[in-house]
């Protein structure tokens, strides 16, 4: 029985590897391998594929092609792209700009799937739980998407819902990342010093934690308690009666995105003081609270 399971696992891994190879070739991303000397030993992965011989060229920029490939490959790769987008100091400008679109511009899953996830979590449809519920997402990311709603008691809330079947998708792709890390570790002396296997293992632990929205709700509630007497930050309230492993419901707060300088100035916000407050908040979380929000965009 165990032999059959291992065989199926290997077949599944091979199938996924071929899908990744096909996607990278389709978007002409094999050029990234050619441009990075440390990865030259892995070029054979592309040269052996018939997909390389018959592909059509595209006029899209390399940044756009990379972003589209990550979106096609699924949530784990989108998450990786999001992580890269927060380090524009390490990336060419054109790539950094495109990857930044992954922060909140990932295609949403359908309204029908949203209703199914709510029914599965609560045992009843959305309109029996909320006074109002918009089944069309207003924001969508790699792991989950957000919906506007109103509780029966009148409070405006944000409903965050995990992508369907994301656990299975993440598990499959983690197997691939671990395999790739082992390949890099074995075939590139230059990249081996970066400890790719350990990096992927840490990344795996981080992503799996993000899949538990009850854990996220608990962290948010703790941050709220840490700042409950502050006049420079407002942390949304968590509505625990509505929180599940795959669903988080929190207070909706109206505001201006911190990167919208024009609108902030129009609202009379002191930009310099805002920056000072942001630094103060972050360092207070890190050095005093030992619990910080690591996704402050």
PLM region descriptions:
Residues 148, 155-163:
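Glycine-rich ATP phosphate-binding loop
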Residues 93, 100-107, 119, 171-172, ...:
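ATP-dependent phospho-/nucleotidyl transfer catalytic cores
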Residues 152-154, 254:
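Short acidic-glycine loop/turn motifs at beta-strand connectors
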Residues 2-145, 168-196:
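N-terminal accessory/targeting segments that precede structured cores
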Residues 137-143, 150-152, 222:
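Conserved actuator
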Residues 149-150, 296:
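Conserved beta3 strand of the Hanks-type protein kinase catalytic N-lobe
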Residues 143, 155, 245-246:
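Residues on conserved beta-strands of the protein kinase catalytic domain
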């Amino acid at each position: 029985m165990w032999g059959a399971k291992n065989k199926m696992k290997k077949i599944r891994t091979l199938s996924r590897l071929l899908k990744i190879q096909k996607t990278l070739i389709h978007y002409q991303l094999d050029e990234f391998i050619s441009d990075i000397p440390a990865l030259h030993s892995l070029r054979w992965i592309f040269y052996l594929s018939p997909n390389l011989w018959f592909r059509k060229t595209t006029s899209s920029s390399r940044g756009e092609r990379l972003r589209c490939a990550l979106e096609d490959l699924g949530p784990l790769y989108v998450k990786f792209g999001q992580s890269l987008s927060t380090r524009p100091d390490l990336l060419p400008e054109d790539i950094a700009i495109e990857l930044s679109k992954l922060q909140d511009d990932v295609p949403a899953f359908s309204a029908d799937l949203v209703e199914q996830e709510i029914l599965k979590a609560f045992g009843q449809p959305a309109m029996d739980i909320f006074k109002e519920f918009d089944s069309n997402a207003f924001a969508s990311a790699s792991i989950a998407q957000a919906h506007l709603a109103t509780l029966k008691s009148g409070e405006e809330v944000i409903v965050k819902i995990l992508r369907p079947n994301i656990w299975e998708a993440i598990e499959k792709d983690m197997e691939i990342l671990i395999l790739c890390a082992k390949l890099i570790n074995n075939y590139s002396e230059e990249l081996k010093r970066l400890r790719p296997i350990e990096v992927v293992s840490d990344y795996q632990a981080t992503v799996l934690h993000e899949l538990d929205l009850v854990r996220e709700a608990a962290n948010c509630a703790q941050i709220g308690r840490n700042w409950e007497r502050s006049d420079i930050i407002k942390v949304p309230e968590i509505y625990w009666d509505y929180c599940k492993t795959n669903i988080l419901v929190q207070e909706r707060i109206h505001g201006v995105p911190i990167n919208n300088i024009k609108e902030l100035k129009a609202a009379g916000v002191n930009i310099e003081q805002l920056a000072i407050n942001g630094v103060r908040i972050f360092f207070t979380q890190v050095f005093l609270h030992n619990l910080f929000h690591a996704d402050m965009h």
